[in-house]
Amino acid sequence: PKKVDIFRTTVYEINGRIDVDGNAKLYHVEHFIEGDYMKYNSNSGFVDHKTCRQTPQAFSHFTFERSGHELIVVDIQGVGDLYTDPQIHTVNGIDYGDGNLGVKGMALFFHSHSFLNFLHEKNGKFICYLFFKCRNW
């Protein structure tokens, strides 16, 4: 198994700073990530066909399966397998900001690639393998 990580962020509220609606302004801050920054997929179905890496797509797919098909983590970007600023789509389309496209966003993710999945038994444990192939439009 390959390890992935989501970069830790901080949110700041600066006293006296308000938006046009009178709400406190919030600032999302994170450390600089050294290396070649890549966007692997988006919340609207984009997949980088130049790299079409397996791990980011598998991570998104894993979040869908692990949540019982209730949500999916997309908009995977970062350096290598250190991801930053993900977006979450939920079945009901509620929470997680304006980028939550709900079931439509989930469908866009699955439309962007095809995958082959099979189980393999090893030492009495079943391992699920997913192989992704980006669709070239």
Where are these regions (language model features)?
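Short linear interaction motifs
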Residues: 51-67
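Conserved structural core of kinase catalytic domains
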Residues: 1-53, 83-137
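Catalytic-loop of the protein kinase fold
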Residues: 63-85
